[in-house]
Structure formats: structure tokens, C-alpha cells
Amino acid sequence: MIRQRTLKSIVQMTGVGLHSGRKVTLTLRPAAANTGVIYRRTDLNPPVDFPADPESVRDTMLCTALVNDEGVRISTVEHLNAALAGMGIDNVVIEVDAPEIPIMDGSASPFVYLLQSAGIEELNTAKKFIRIKKPVRIEDGDKWAEIRPYNGFRLDFTIDFNHPAIESDDQKLVFDFSSQSFIKDISRARTFGFMRDIEYLQSQNLCLGGSFDCAIVLDDYRILNEDGLRFDNEFVTHKVLDAVGDLYMSGHSILGELRAYKSGHALNNQLLRAVLADQEAWEWTTIEDEQESPVAFMQPGMVLA
């Protein structure tokens, strides 16, 4: 059977908070089967837990933030959540001594490296998948996102930026998920933003950790980063990375195909909520025979070494 996964050991990294600009320490701890993904703020006394849950996502303005009923939040979880999805981690406790996860280089790659450093341990409990049974679609003006039945996990994503630095041929990506392909083709794509927006936010005491080290930065005509892009379609690839993380806010891998046009964190979250609210749209399933596993969730082998 396909088994649940956790980490072999405790790992830690430090980075800078995107919004505060301050040093943040992140600690990942192994967890028992059926624990799920739990974010924990240890800077509060007592510590506050935020289980991965689409209903906890209450702010998607500048990042994905989990907010509890008392208004306590933990921000910028999306890239770490994408790395957890990419590595198939079902059970982990994520401790952070600040109100936000460190931004690192603006991609999921540092978190993938951290997970690989910890090592992956398979537990003797079946992994529970969310299998999509019928199409569900959410629209917002000309933006839309829908998820459909599919034996695997596929993302078909289109963006539409009218900008000289973003070629029209590089605004669509179809990605068939597997751990190897996520690490190789998706995890290194960085978030992006416009210099005018960053300057405005910093004038409002926000985005104080924003810099060329953690994002692709554009003005009205060009990319301002000296090293340019990591690959030609990095913009749409990062949107796919975001969607992988957003859909994993259920805490479970999905068997289905996401199709999206100009979607972002908010629409992705609305779609996930709509799916889970419709009992006829999905079902729990396990994969007892690994030979019958979709390629997306076959044993990653050397990735886990």
C-alpha cells in the first residue's frame, strides 16, 4: 500500500520574515500517523497550533495566512506547504518563533532541501487521498479555477500578464505531478512582484523583508534582478507551485486535475472549500496495491534517500 510519511529527524533553518524583515527560526518535527500538517507559533505563551485546513485560510492579500478564531495568524505558509505536498509529507509539526514562515529565496526549493536533510520515514498506515468524483468550478470575473476527475494529479495553468518581460508563449503550463518532477521542474520557481508595489508596501511598514534575494522584481519594462530568470516560464511555474501548496491545505494529496486561468491563492482556496463542502464531489481513498498507483504517487525512491 501507499503509506503515510513523516520526517526521520528534527531539522531547523533560519531566514528572514517577508513582512517583518526580522530573523525567523523554523523547526520541523516528525509526527505520528494521522497527525496531519500542524503549524505552531512558539513565540506565543502558550504556543498556538494551526492545523492545515482550507477554512483557516482567511487572508490571501499578500500571502497565504492561517488565522484562528481569536485573530492570531501565521503568514507566508504557501511555499513550505508546496514543498510538503511535493515530498508527500502527511504528518509534521512546523514550529516557528514568529508570526510568519521565513521567505528564503521566494521558492519552495530551500524547504525541499530541508525536508531531504531530515530524511523521509514511511509509517505503517495507509495514506488517505482525496479523489475527485465530479467537476467543481469557481469563477471571479474573467478568472476561474476548476478541478476534475483524473487518475493522478495534474495542473493545467494559464496566466495573462501584459508585460514586455513576460512572453505570451511562457504563460501556460501543464504539469503532471510526481515528487521528482516537482523538485526538478517546479520547486525552484520564485515569487514575483513589481518594484512600485514593493516600495509602496514598505512605505506602509509591510514587506520589509522583500528584496531581490527573495523574489523576481519587475518595473514597467523589464526584470530588475541581475541574474534574470531561472527558466523562461518561471512566472507561470511559480503560480503552479502556489496552487500545489494551496490545494495541500486540505492536508491530503488530491487525485484530480486542476485547470485554472489567472487564478491565485484566493480562488484556489475557494475552489478547495467548494470541493470539500460538496460530499458528492469527492471521496476518501487509499491505494492498497502500489503497482496500481498513479505515477504521481509512486514511491519516489532516490528522492527520499
Swiss-Prot record:
Recorded catalytic activity of this chain's protein: a UDP-3-O-[(3R)-3-hydroxyacyl]-N-acetyl-alpha-D-glucosamine + H2O = a UDP-3-O-[(3R)-3-hydroxyacyl]-alpha-D-glucosamine + acetate
Q: Which UniProt keywords apply?
A: Hydrolase, Lipid A biosynthesis, Lipid biosynthesis, Lipid metabolism, Metal-binding, Zinc
Catalytic residues? 265
Report the top EC class in one word: hydrolase
- What is the E.C. number? 3.5.1.108
Q: Which GO terms describe its biological process?
A: lipid A biosynthetic process
Family as reported in the entry's similarity comment: Belongs to the LpxC family.
Q: What is the name listed in the Swiss-Prot or TrEMBL entry for this protein?
A: UDP-3-O-acyl-N-acetylglucosamine deacetylase
Gene from which the chain derives: lpxC
